[in-house]
Amino acid sequence: TSIDRSAKVTLMEDGVLIAPAPYTSASAYYFPTSGRINSVEVLKGPSSISAGPSTIGGAINLISTPIPEMTSGKLVQEFGENGMIRTHANYGVNSGDFGALIEIHDHSSDGFASIANVGGDTGFDKSDLMLKARYESGNHSLAFKYLDLDETSEQSYVGLSQVSFNINPHRRYGMTQYDEMQNDG
């Protein structure tokens, strides 16, 4: 694959461009947490032109959890291998002209890879907090959305040689023990 990642496709969340510099560096290093996505809208051809620059390959609009039509909430708790824990909760209210939603998505794992000769963590911790509010008056509406993302991933861009992969595909080289990605939003 090309190092340009998604440069030929415009990525959006709720109609807002995701790429930090869509005209100069359209490749996306951020991608919304899939657990928060309610639906996906795909635009191809002339319909994608209104989505902004870099739409040669089309546009993808990821639509987050909507404000509910009536007061409701949801809680999902999952546990898995390698210390995986995922919590997804939301609560929304709607009363006539006003609606609001709070959503939390927390996901962590100890990781499944091993770092050769030194050990160490290969997992991640990712936490999303989203607040939405909407006010409607006649033919007009005002919407507000706030999103806070925090992520620490003990991952590396360094791959394995074919020989190392054949021996153990879940191993990482010892020199990658200090590789860490931190995103605080």
State what each model feature region is:
Residues 27, 47, 51, 76-78, ...:
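Outer-membrane beta-barrel domain signature
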Residues 64-72, 105-114, 124, 165-175:
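Flexible, solvent-exposed coil segments and beta strand-coil junctions
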Residues 72, 79-108, 117-156, 183-185:
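Transmembrane beta-barrel wall of Gram-negative outer-membrane proteins
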Residues 23, 114-116, 143-175:
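Outer-membrane beta-barrel and related beta-rich outer-membrane complex signature
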Residues 40-41, 60, 102:
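Non-catalytic regulatory/gating segments with a bias toward low-complexity or hydrophobic composition
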Residues 9, 16-44:
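Short acidic/polar hinge/loop motifs at secondary-structure boundaries
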Residues 18-20, 46-50, 109:
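Short beta-strands and strand-coil junctions in structured, solvent-facing domains, enriched
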Residues 2, 13-15, 44, 64-66:
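Flexible glycine-/small-residue-rich
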